[in-house]
Every structure is written in C-alpha cells, then in structure tokens.
Amino acid sequence: MLICKVLKPLVSTNRIPGFEHKHLQVVLDGSSNKVAVDAVGCKPGDWVICVGSSAAREAAGSKSYPSDLTIVGIIDHWDPDSPKQIEV
C-alpha cells in the first residue's frame, strides 16, 4: 500500500471498452505523479491509501480490470512532515 496526495482529476473520454467510466485522479507518490482509479470519491488535496498490482484491479471492480493503482481509502488525518515515531 502507498500513501499518496490527490493532485487533480484526470479526464479521459476515449477509453478501451474494459476501462468503463471509473473516475481517475492524478496522485503524487513521493516525487512522481501517477494516475489512479478512484474507487472512493476523493477530491484534490486529500491524502489517500492506494494499492497496486492485482489488489488494484480487484479494488477497481474485477481481476481483469486494467489498473495498476487504485485509491481504496481517504486518510482522515495525516501529517507528512511529522517525525517518524520511534518505539521505545
């Protein structure tokens, strides 16, 4: 799983038949932009949990769905600048 920030929606009206009409979002994963299928209805600025590989296809609706990154959750609170917690 990845923690990503949603940057903006991506509109693609000309798609292959199996791609259906699922919403797409541009997300920031570290320093790179990626396209993710939005399975939860997030908006720009949200921090989200994304899954990849076969989990992404299944989360998008089917193991045959052509996705390698799907948003599966919106994070309620995330401070990316907070220091890592150290277990004592």
Curated annotation (Swiss-Prot):
Pfam families: EutN_CcmL. It is found in: Carboxysome. Residues 1-76 form the BMV domain. GO terms for cellular component: carboxysome. It comes from the Bacteria. This is Carboxysome shell vertex protein CsoS4A. The gene is csoS4A. Homopentamer. The tight homopentamer forms a pore with an opening of about 3.5 Angstroms in diameter which is positively charged. The lineage of its organism: Bacteria, Bacillati, Cyanobacteriota, Cyanophyceae, Synechococcales. GO terms for biological process: carbon fixation; photosynthesis. SUPFAM superfamilies: EutN/CcmL-like (SSF159133). Probably forms vertices in the carboxysome, a polyhedral inclusion where RuBisCO (ribulose bisphosphate carboxylase, cbbL-cbbS) is sequestered. Has been modeled to induce curvature upon insertion into an otherwise flat hexagonal layer of major carboxysome subunits. Has not been identified in purified carboxysomes; it is expected to be present in very low amounts. Belongs to the CcmL/EutN family. CsoS4 subfamily. Keywords: Bacterial microcompartment, Carbon dioxide fixation, Carboxysome, Photosynthesis.
